[in-house]
């Protein structure tokens, strides 16, 4: 999955938003009144349930705003608006939460005195409004929205820019609406970067695969953030106490991609062969994503015979470790490669057959030990990750439905 240069992409299904938007409109009995005394014009609208429909783009949502009952007056003429169903495009924007400026709320933004933030797409989807009435209705409708903006305080999403998981905290972000070409449900997306870098040239494209058919929300993390914050901390979990995450670092290959290398010699734990312990060392280690859902690990090292430091073998290993998510126990891991490739070269005194036999055995078990440790499990905090920075429609996600790795790392989930 593609982040298109963004660090983290958050997505929510249109059908989920519509459910909660409907509840909001019903509960709050939304109605607008606007009048212009000088022009002897007035409009009143009591709204039925609003519904987001496909067709929105960038930071505009396309919405059906059916009028349950209402009217507009122009001079001495009154036009009944009951059953009229306007289709509008309304801009969404981020605003600071009143009590906590570190919470950015995604809300309607149609309070501008200009008409740029709200557009009428269809005056009446039901076709009941007379053509000669549309001109006045359209002008009054927009003015009514502008004057009554404070009545609509619905929050589509709350973004926490100072969350407990610091590496996820967005520094810059924007909202986009994604409308699939096959006319299936659209999605609301928030695109974010976690560093202060220029985003003016980043694409507003999104990957619709972030949300599955059975998921309400999705979270897509870039390759580099995944390696830095989810792989690096677990990579050494099977390598013994002498090796930890501080022995590795992520080398950037772009703003959103990278690879893991060692920054110091990796001192493997002691391997007992016969009566003695031997201690392999890895001098060169490289790990990168491969074919989207695998880790390709290449390393070179050596192991010396204890007491005979001049007798040693160089070895190389290449391992392909596939990502697996177990939906039953909710665990994600990189499995051990069943067919890794390896090579080695012995360094010993000519004719020393005893050392050769020992070195052969020590090299074999060193390689097997390292190959078996290159599979590891990720920390199972997927619910925390998907809830950490964002709340869609004030929902808390309690169920992870799927976790995938396909260049980007994706978590999908549902609320209760």
Curated annotation (Swiss-Prot):
Part of a botulinum neurotoxin type A2 (BoNT) locus; may be part of a progenitor toxin complex required to protect BoNT during its passage through the host gastrointestinal tract. The keyword 4Fe-4S does not apply. Pfam families: Clostridium_P47 (PF06597). The gene is p47. It comes from the Bacteria. Part of a crude toxin extract that includes BoNTA2/NTNH, P47, OrfX2 and OrfX3; OrfX1 was not detected. Belongs to the TULIP P47 family. Induction: The toxin locus has divergently transcribed operons maximally expressed during early stationary phase. This is part of the p47-ntnh-botA operon. The crude toxin extract was isolated from cells that had been growing statically for 96 hours (at protein level). InterPro entries: Clostridium_P47 (IPR010567). The keyword Flavoprotein does not apply. This is Protein P47. Keywords: Virulence. An elongated protein with a middle beta-sheet wrapped around a long alpha-helix. Structurally similar to tubular lipid-binding (TULIP) superfamily proteins. The N-terminal domain (residues 35-175) folds very similarly to OrfX2 (residues 6-168), another protein of the same locus. This structure is very similar to OrfX3 in the OrfX1-OrfX3 complex from P.bifermentans (AC A0A5P3XKL3, PDB:8BGM). Disulfide bonds: none annotated. The lineage of its organism: Bacteria, Bacillati, Bacillota, Clostridia, Eubacteriales.
